[in-house]
């Protein structure tokens, strides 16, 4: 099914390339190599999934039926090898950012609490200004509130 989808998608891309004469079309070698790589990836994925099913069946059939408690502990120890695709790696990189850190442990100290009245009453704070929306050239930053008092151009 997925091979058929790949072939139809590549035929569609080839047709779009044929209609646009101003762009260079891909050489035949690169298109053939792309098709071959996609088919090989699909076949490899199917083989790995079939092998995992076979390994699980063989693993469960070799255990004796009388050792139910041992079977439960063995099932928890058996973890199939997962193939990490580029999408999973991208998601992993996305959530392992250096800008924030997620933790399950309880912090040793509570964060410091500042009263806003004390902060505003302090005469040393001169740069306190109301927040206002950014007007940036880039669309992704338009309409966001600035988190600092200084202004910078994007």
From Swiss-Prot:
Main localization category: secreted
Family: Belongs to the NGF-beta family.
Record GO biological process: cell surface receptor protein tyrosine kinase signaling pathway; modulation of chemical synaptic transmission; negative regulation of neuron apoptotic process; nerve development; nerve growth factor signaling pathway; neuron projection morphogenesis
Pfam families to which the protein is assigned, alphabetical: NTF3_N (PF19338)
MF-aspect GO terms: growth factor activity; nerve growth factor receptor binding
This protein's name: Neurotrophin-3
Signal peptide: 1-18
Entry-linked InterPro entries: Nerve_growth_factor-like (IPR020408), Neurotrophin-3 (IPR015578), NTF3_N (IPR045815)
Alphabetical UniProt keywords: Cleavage on pair of basic residues, Growth factor, Secreted, Signal
Function according to Swiss-Prot or TrEMBL: Seems to promote the survival of visceral and proprioceptive sensory neurons.
